[in-house]
Amino acid sequence: MKKFLALSVFAALSHSAWADVNYSLAVTQPEHHLGEVSVEFPQTAQAHLDVKLPAWRTGRYEILNLANGVRFFEAKDDSGKALRWEKIDASTWRIHLDKATQVKVDYQIYANELGKRARHIDDSHAFIDASGFFMFSESFRQEPVTVNLDVPKAWRSVSGMANAGSKHSFKAADYDVLVDSPIETGISEQHKFAVDGRDYELVIWGEGNYDVDQMLEDLKKLVTTGSVIWDDYPYQRYVFMVHATSGAGGATEHLNSTIIQRPRDRFGSREDYLAFISTATHEFIHTWNVKAYRPEGLVPYDYTHMNFDKLLWIAEGSTSYFEDHLMVRAGISTTDEFLKTLTKTVNRHLLTPGRKVQSATETSFDKWIGQGGDHARNYSTNIYLEGSLISMALDIDLLSKSQGKQSYRDVHRALYNQYKMPHGFSANDVKTVLNDLTGRDYSQWWADNVDAPAAIDFDALFAKVGLELKRPKDAKAVASVDAMAKNTGELLTLTHVRRDGAAWQAGLTTDDKIVAINKKHVGKDLTASLETFKAGDKVTVDFIRRDTLQSTTLVLSNDFDKDKKLVANEDATAEQMALFKAWMGVDHPNLAKK
């Protein structure tokens, strides 16, 4: 009886050890970007167990085919016996079972994709996004998980996940939490601080020209701004991970952390620093918008296929819109810096021919297959730019019709309160929120500005908040070919030809190399080569295409040497200035000068 009881206890303990899904990663050959992964799955009585590595990672709407880094795959049962397996698609391994058993899989992972923010191993650190390292089974996706790392002694490990008994182990409620909680392990600089009862960490891998004290000061300001939009915070602890490196840039949001990558020498100037802190703000806002509530097409995540949705302009564009507002409200950036940034956004929109072709709905759905480049600029928009401006137009519309009492912030507060994960929201849900908030039907507005290419009247829009979009008085009219070019040795190569512009009408296209205008060699500056001409002039352009010298006639168009700028209207009324303050949370520039 005692022997049977002892065996029963042992069996129970063994089963409990494998009741969770257990992940292990050993950094074995860091100089070659290699690690060894083990995954232990609980007992299953299925005829086969399918295990998968995601094809993409959260926060990046692009198929990355992460399974291409897997080699030496093996599967064993709970007695150590090898199990037969086969690969049935690009990212799925099918393990055949002839009895009920726990399953262990082992494989080598190659991690040298730092810029994709999915996986990287070298002799100084490992960046671990579970999407790029850890396989999962749909059968056990909802089970608790643990992660254990075997890394060099000098390394420190940090994640948004809670520790699981040692400094290199972590635990999560399930695979979805794991995959949205990256781990930074290695030689890093770490700083901790607390604000309003919540804990924060700043972890920096790499050396650069950053000012840690300034970063900490502004991050402390930033994290207080969540209450400007939402009623509460969806976390108790948050981690800012920063890679100061070379050859990588960008950022990704996660549940209660973010990873931000910048060139190591791009922190020092005011412009570079604002780019960094605005990125941190963008990812911080995502803690609510995308992580706490998101469009229904992303709920739940399908890790092996494209997750299409028509509201990515809200997920990303509205986040971009709010980032500039929160930076001003936090006192991180000035009103003048905000107006400068918004000016660039508006001018970029106006110079994008695709804004007249593709709607926010379409660009959201097509994000997964967006190709970028010249064709995209001429025939497409993007979810960040277009979504930001549509959000602004809606915000000012709400404010102006309610005398500053209702705003787009109220819309996102309602989305957070009513559609928290695991629920998603639809376009109809957003329109319902708008209708409930205002008592007005926004269906036609949505049809005109979201489902159709948005035709924003910037002059009328900015007038409501006491601003003007105007060209500087010293701007001069200049001749233009409506194209952009870069210097490639002795010749200028066209990089963008604006649809229906002068160069387009003349038959020029991207990658044409400009040799001469009216038989005179074009130097390194296309604009300088046009200084002696005026709009309407016909010129002969000699160019090389496919190694063949060709010629065309081009009629120069009219342009200006300076773009329009968004400035304060010196004659703004008290009502307009009050609406500006309701919009931005700070005084109108006219009042700020007094």
Q: Which sequence ranges carry the predicted segments?
A:
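Juxtacatalytic substrate-recognition/specificity segment
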Residues: E189-L312, S318, F322
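A generic secondary-structure signal for well-formed alpha-helical elements
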Residues: W155, W230-P234, E283-A292, E296, ...
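Non-catalytic architectural context of zinc metalloproteases
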Residues: T28, E40, I63-F72, K76-Y235, ...
